[in-house]
Amino acid sequence: MAQHTVYFPDAFLTQMREAMPSTLSFDDFLAACQRPLRRSIRVNTLKTSVADFLQLTAPYGWTLTPIPWCEEGFWIERDSEDALPLGSTAEHLSGLFYIQEASSMLPVAALFADGNAPQRVMDVAAAPGSKTTQIAARMNNKGAILANEFSASRVKVLHANISRCGISNVALTHFDGRVFGAAVPEMFDAILLDAPCSGEGVVRKDPDALKNWSPESNQEIAATQRELIDSAFHALRLGGTLVYSTCTLNREENEAVCLWLKETYHDAVEFLPLGDLFPGANKALTEDGFLHVFPQIYDCEGFFVARLRKTQAIPVLPAPKYKVGNFPFSPVKDREAGQIRQAAASVGLNWDENLRLWQRDKELWLFPVGIEALIGKVRFSRLGIKLAETHNKGYRWQHEAVIALASPDNVNAFELTPQEAEEWYRGRDVYPQAAPVADDVLVTFQHQPIGLAKRIGSRLKNSYPRELVRDGKLFTGNA
């Protein structure tokens, strides 16, 4: 790989020399930072198995190297530099994989280590969604996830990724993460706080990441991180697991934040060592059992991960003063819910007891049951999946529900050719050589549901959402 020139402030280099353990070479650190980052992907096991994915992509000649801490994660090498962007491949468009940096797969691995099986999880700083979607896959779309994002502009991206991956057990919120300790005390079995940080570990992806770096900025960020971890710890139930992570390298934003929590709450905080998380984890292990990943250790981004358990109750914070407002949804009555379920099944949409029907005016929604305890405590940006809109002639089934709930083996499923699938993703109607029989057609490609179409004569009317329509070169190679 070609080198690229990374900007390093002198004070940063001094700080890294002091922070780096004697077992590591500082020259190796500098050399690793100058190398471009290896690309990596994670197979979405909600949609396919790793074995089936490897078989499906074998003809492409990709070199996929397993990532030690994530069974479904791979570093990827491709022959041609001007190859089709990974985001334009059919497998990415249908949600079979997520483009995710290898080290960012570590926090979720830590969250579910040692057989941990949480039922209600919070991702405090969730956008763009790599870790939320990874958590959902580990939970197999069961239970419930509260995915919060403080930046309003990033909530839309977060939802798009959740929808593409076929995830149904997520509620989205748009809050400052510091409110949750007071708003939802002891409500979560597990919490991931991938904290906003100075980003010192991302220089391999962004050589100018340290242009605005300063020790003073680190201190300001660490102060915010302490407030965030304090809030998260209050929101964690007794016996629950909290994972704290950053993509930065200084001790102040990493070890010091965790040690501050321990000093504040003493025996209520138990550090859970991560030395056995994966083979070779001991290379990054600190004396407190955290993983401080310098980029030269595993040839990835710099990263920090700590796992802790709440072993004692702590004083409750004062209740928040904000008003949530009236919840605009109401549960669908059992009889009507049965009729809706039957109609949905006729077009290939099915769901289990983890989801419950709610309605708002003419909209029908499916909410994860595990999130209902939070209604009235927080204001949601989006909850579960929108199933349908009702109209005089029945139901207008929603694209996100098709991606999350449809079975490609349903009687109305119709497999498109690559050229037809590409037309579908471009938002155009499809004219198959042999028209399907059903009026409501479950459109599939590579045996994956990619939408629902109305058959009008020999034409399949495109219902692909306008905001998702793709231009340019796609997987058949035609622009």
Swiss-Prot record:
<dbReference type="InterPro" id="IPR011023">
    <property type="entry name" value="Nop2p"/>
</dbReference>
<feature type="binding site">
    <location>
        <position position="194"/>
    </location>
    <ligand>
        <name>S-adenosyl-L-methionine</name>
    </ligand>
</feature>
<dbReference type="InterPro" id="IPR018314">
    <property type="entry name" value="RsmB/NOL1/NOP2-like_CS"/>
</dbReference>
<comment type="function">
    <text>Specifically methylates the cytosine at position 1407 (m5C1407) of 16S rRNA.</text>
</comment>
<dbReference type="GO" id="GO:0009383">
    <property type="term" value="F:rRNA (cytosine-C5-)-methyltransferase activity"/>
</dbReference>
<feature type="binding site">
    <location>
        <begin position="125"/>
        <end position="131"/>
    </location>
    <ligand>
        <name>S-adenosyl-L-methionine</name>
    </ligand>
</feature>
<keyword id="KW-0694">RNA-binding</keyword>
<keyword id="KW-0698">rRNA processing</keyword>
<dbReference type="InterPro" id="IPR023267">
    <property type="entry name" value="RCMT"/>
</dbReference>
<dbReference type="InterPro" id="IPR029063">
    <property type="entry name" value="SAM-dependent_MTases_sf"/>
</dbReference>
<protein>
    <recommendedName>
        <fullName>Ribosomal RNA small subunit methyltransferase F</fullName>
        <ecNumber>2.1.1.178</ecNumber>
    </recommendedName>
</protein>
<dbReference type="InterPro" id="IPR048457">
    <property type="entry name" value="YebU_pre-PUA_dom"/>
</dbReference>
<comment type="similarity">
    <text>Belongs to the class I-like SAM-binding methyltransferase superfamily. RsmB/NOP family.</text>
</comment>
<feature type="binding site">
    <location>
        <position position="176"/>
    </location>
    <ligand>
        <name>S-adenosyl-L-methionine</name>
    </ligand>
</feature>
<feature type="binding site">
    <location>
        <position position="149"/>
    </location>
    <ligand>
        <name>S-adenosyl-L-methionine</name>
    </ligand>
</feature>
<dbReference type="GO" id="GO:0070475">
    <property type="term" value="P:rRNA base methylation"/>
</dbReference>
<dbReference type="GO" id="GO:0003723">
    <property type="term" value="F:RNA binding"/>
</dbReference>
<dbReference type="Pfam" id="PF13636">
    <property type="entry name" value="Methyltranf_PUA"/>
</dbReference>
<dbReference type="InterPro" id="IPR031341">
    <property type="entry name" value="Methyltr_RsmF_N"/>
</dbReference>
<dbReference type="InterPro" id="IPR049560">
    <property type="entry name" value="MeTrfase_RsmB-F_NOP2_cat"/>
</dbReference>
<keyword id="KW-0489">Methyltransferase</keyword>
<dbReference type="Pfam" id="PF17125">
    <property type="entry name" value="Methyltr_RsmF_N"/>
</dbReference>
<dbReference type="InterPro" id="IPR027391">
    <property type="entry name" value="Nol1_Nop2_Fmu_2"/>
</dbReference>
<keyword id="KW-0963">Cytoplasm</keyword>
<dbReference type="GO" id="GO:0005737">
    <property type="term" value="C:cytoplasm"/>
</dbReference>
<feature type="active site" description="Nucleophile">
    <location>
        <position position="247"/>
    </location>
</feature>
<dbReference type="InterPro" id="IPR001678">
    <property type="entry name" value="MeTrfase_RsmB-F_NOP2_dom"/>
</dbReference>
<dbReference type="InterPro" id="IPR023545">
    <property type="entry name" value="rRNA_ssu_MeTfrase_F"/>
</dbReference>
<keyword id="KW-0949">S-adenosyl-L-methionine</keyword>
<dbReference type="Pfam" id="PF01189">
    <property type="entry name" value="Methyltr_RsmB-F"/>
</dbReference>
<keyword id="KW-0808">Transferase</keyword>
<dbReference type="Pfam" id="PF21150">
    <property type="entry name" value="YebU_pre-PUA_dom"/>
</dbReference>
